[in-house]
Structure formats: structure tokens, C-alpha cells
């Protein structure tokens, strides 16, 4: 097994889930995307994620969060801080909002190019694929696409708390964590942190349900311009950002801080989270399918040139 893949296994074992969408969400996106992969795309995923420890595509989906402690420069590549002000105004401008150090949008574009870059070695291609599997999830979490209060991390809230929410000691959550973890866990009946195998099982169950509920939504309807990734990624980012105006912060920060979000807010948020998880998975699958098709075409072209040289 390649050195990088050994590191991947170690990272996966060593850290407990505290990540965007929660590990359950990221794993569910990966499992759901896998159901829509073409045969060449499945081959590409299996080739790049090959390991002898039984780790699967859902483990790859959590890798980009695991390495942030060792590669701190990758932290800003999981989000973008647009100059928005929900609920009054929502917008994303790549030129204005993505700094020269990079953001989630530039990283998704760069990793798209790196997967099939013939100058990249297998480790670099594997890392690129794992970043994409993870970042498609992050992009569809609305609070990864807002500049307000560090993506909602600075908005302290209650969620299914016993104490009145006007008591600051009751505010055990921030808004970002509610969308990352509390809502996905409640959707799936999870009441505590899960270890590796139960977490996989919960994620697979969620993916199976979303697959059954969305059988008529075709994967080939999604944007797959891997040669010009921003043409697809920017509309997705704008869509996620708009959710902050339309729902996430629709009633304002003060209302969020005074309301237990585990009640009516959760009831309205749950179908939005389901839909965002599904869209992330469907778009990820279509993206990998396009990458696999492009890779196969490049290999055929190279084969023709080799024949001409003989």
C-alpha cells in the first residue's frame, strides 16, 4: 500500500468526528454518490482509494478534516466568507470573496484539475479525489458559504435544551454546529457520538433512504464542466449562500439566540438538510463520472500516439 494511504488509514483511526456536516453527513454523501457512479468512475475511485485495511469511500470523505491539524494552511480551503448580510442580502463573488490564499471554490477547481493531471503522482491524485469528496459536502452546508459570525460559529444557540434559552448557560451549541451535527444527528435518531462502524451504518442507512426518495432525479442533469469548474461551482455556492437568507438566518441573529432550534426550526430545517445532502452526492457523482470519462479519453489518446510511434 502506498505511504500516503497508510497515513490516510492512521488519520481515520486516530480522530473522533468533529467535522462539517458531522462525519455522518460526509459519509452519507460519499455512500450516496457511490450509487450513481458509472463503471469507469467506480474503477477510478477504487484505483485511487485502494488500501488493504477495509477502508471505503466514506472514510475518504472525512480525510480532509482529519489533516487540518497537520496542514493548517488547508483550513481556509473548506469555506468562503462572502460579503453578505443575511437575511437582508446574500451573494458570493469569487473575485471579491476568495482571497489569494484560496477558498473552498478555488480548492475544488484545483483538485478537479489535479485528479487527472498526468504530472501528478498517484498520492497527489488520491489526495485530490479525497478533497473533492469532502468539499462537495462542505459547499452544500450553507454556513460554509457565509461571512457572518465566522460561518455561524459565533452565534450561540440552544438545541433541544431543558433550560430556558434566555439563560446563556443553556446555549451549548453554536449555529454552525447545529447545522453540521445536531440536525443531521436528530434526523437519523442519533443521540450520542458514534464509533467508526456504527457511524458507517447510520450513514449508509441515511444514504439508502435518500436514494429511495429521489429515484427519479437523474444524475446526468447536473453540471459537469470539469474543464471550467467555476462554471458549475459558483452557481452551487450562490445557491448555498442564498439558503442563509431564505431560511438559516431568515429571522435574524437575535431570534436564533433566543429560540430553541430543536423545535419548529428543526422541523423546517430537516428537509433542507436532506436535500442538501442529496444534491451534494448527486453532483459529486456526476463530477467523478466526468473525471473518469476524461481520464479514459486521455488514455485512449495516449494509446493512439504510442501506436503511431511503433
Which residues are covered by each model-predicted region?
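Cleavable N-terminal signal peptides of Sec/SRP-targeted secreted and luminal proteins
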Residues: 2-20
